[in-house]
């Protein structure tokens, strides 16, 4: 007796359905009704089976066999399709463990043309066939065949073929692929129809057409879909948290003078060996001016610190904590404590010396050499230990300063005395009247305006 996947007993009856030509009770589905309605317009022509992915031609290669199960599609390049031994056979009602043996067949799908005119090949899809069926029905289990992966359960006898009938698409629909609990699906692949498949949506539409009691009962019996994690779910969660805290995730954080001062003070409060210089706390504030003992850093890198775009590639040369302690020469030196008026305390220095070795095979070697040459002993090239240029003044302030300098350079005459200021002013009518009495002729000329004409 041949087994039919998806059927517990070939002789069982159902409350609704119709018998096919081979005597097997076939469940009537919405898809069957659609096909039957379409066949009424064929005017006696022979029914043609609907093509599926396994029968569509691709570069002249046709697979004239229907799998009992939905396919597994690859969505990541470079991933290998394989299962752990004893796993990989889809489960179906009515198939005993002894018949769970077969192979996965790789179907190379068609290519398509992209908008820029290039041909892009779709990643392959895999279909399962029981041993003794499908495109390699004559092959023995374990034969080395390109595009074939053999799978079998632990109880299956792989020396004999499986007693499974071929699927007739006009009588049986493909079964959604499911595996036994504990099966590890190959990475980079997904099962077709594992989400909201067409059968699920059809069953939902049928349940809605029933009464309210039946609909409530069927909805309670339906399995709830598994929660899925979207790629951008982490960003959504972060945005919700920020919104809860009253912050806008899309708005860039503005650095004010107060916040920069707080950042700088926070860095300077750390021990010297734990400080990380940046824009708010430049290198020289963290570690002092450049000189013979601290000879690294050009003007730009001293301003930006670790925020400099060239710094990350230099950080590749920095030793790890393990390399620092175990790959360096260390010496513990006690230093003198503070002055006489300072409290007595023991001060030590852990002095170290070592080397970082690299060669031209290091990724980014040329860039590293360029950055090193620009920043090593840069204080000597820039004319002093302090290579940071003074902060430029604003244009308005600079112009005001220039005007002030011009005023300072111009020699200004001393102010006149009060007598001189009074003489230079014009005579009023009262002044003219008074002068007329003084003068003999009693007339004051019109041009008389100062004491020089008197």
UniProtKB/Swiss-Prot annotation:
ADP-ribosylated. The ADP-ribosylation is retained in the virion during infection. Phosphorylated on serine and threonine residues. Signal peptide: none annotated. Residues 1-62, 159-230, 249-292, 382-428 are annotated as: Disordered. Residues 260-383 form the CoV N CTD domain. The modification Phosphoserine is found at residues 170, 194, 389, 424. Belongs to the betacoronavirus nucleocapsid protein family. This is Nucleoprotein. It comes from Murine coronavirus (strain S) (MHV-S). The gene is N.
């Amino acid at each position: 007796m041949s087994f039919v996947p998806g059927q517990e007993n070939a002789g069982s009856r159902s409350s609704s359905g119709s018998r096919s030509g081979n005597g097997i009770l076939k469940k009537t589905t919405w898809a069957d009704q659609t096909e039957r309605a379409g066949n009424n317009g064929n005017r006696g022509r022979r029914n043609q089976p609907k093509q599926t992915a396994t029968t569509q031609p691709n570069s002249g290669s046709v697979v004239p066999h229907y799998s009992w199960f939905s396919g597994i599609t690859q969505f990541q390049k470079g991933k290998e399709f394989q299962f752990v031994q004893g796993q990989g056979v889809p489960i179906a009602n009515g198939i005993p463990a002894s018949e769970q043996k077969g192979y996965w067949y790789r179907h190379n799908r068609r290519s398509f043309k992209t908008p820029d005119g290039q041909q892009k090949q779709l990643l392959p899809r895999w279909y399962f066939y029981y041993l003794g069926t499908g495109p390699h029905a004559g092959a023995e289990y374990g034969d080395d065949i390109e595009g074939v992966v053999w799978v079998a359960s632990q109880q299956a006898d792989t020396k004999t073929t499986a007693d499974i009938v071929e699927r007739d698409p006009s009588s049986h629909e493909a079964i959604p692929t499911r595996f036994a609990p504990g099966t590890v699906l190959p990475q980079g692949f997904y099962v077709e129809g594992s989400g909201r498949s067409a059968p699920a949506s059809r069953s939902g539409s049928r349940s809605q057409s029933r009464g309210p009691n039946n609909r409530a009962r069927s909805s309670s019996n339906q399995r709830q879909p598994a929660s899925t994690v979207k790629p951008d779910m982490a960003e959504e969660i972060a945005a919700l948290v920020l919104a809860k805290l009253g912050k806008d995730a899309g708005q860039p954080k503005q650095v004010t003078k107060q916040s920069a001062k707080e950042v700088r003070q926070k860095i300077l409060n750390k021990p010297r060996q734990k400080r990380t210089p940046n824009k708010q706390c430049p290198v020289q504030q963290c570690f002092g001016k450049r000189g013979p003992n601290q000879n690294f850093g050009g003007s730009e890198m001293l301003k930006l610190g670790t925020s400099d775009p060239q710094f990350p590639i230099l950080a590749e040369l920095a030793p790890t904590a393990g390399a620092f302690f175990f790959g360096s020469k260390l010496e513990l030196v006690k230093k003198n404590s503070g002055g006489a008026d300072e409290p007595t305390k023991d001060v030590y220095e852990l002095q170290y010396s070592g080397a970082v070795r690299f060669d031209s095979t290091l990724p980014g070697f040329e860039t590293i050499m360029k950055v090193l040459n620009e920043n090593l002993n840069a204080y000597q090239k820039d004319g002093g230990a302090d290579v940071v240029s003074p902060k430029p003044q604003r244009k308005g302030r600079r112009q005001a300063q220039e005007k002030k300098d011009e005023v300072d350079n111009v020699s200004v005459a001393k102010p006149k005395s009060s007598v001189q200021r009074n003489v230079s002013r014009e005579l009023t009518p009262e002044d003219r009247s008074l002068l007329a009495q003084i003068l003999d002729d009693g007339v004051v000329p019109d041009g008389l305006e100062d004491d020089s004409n008197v």
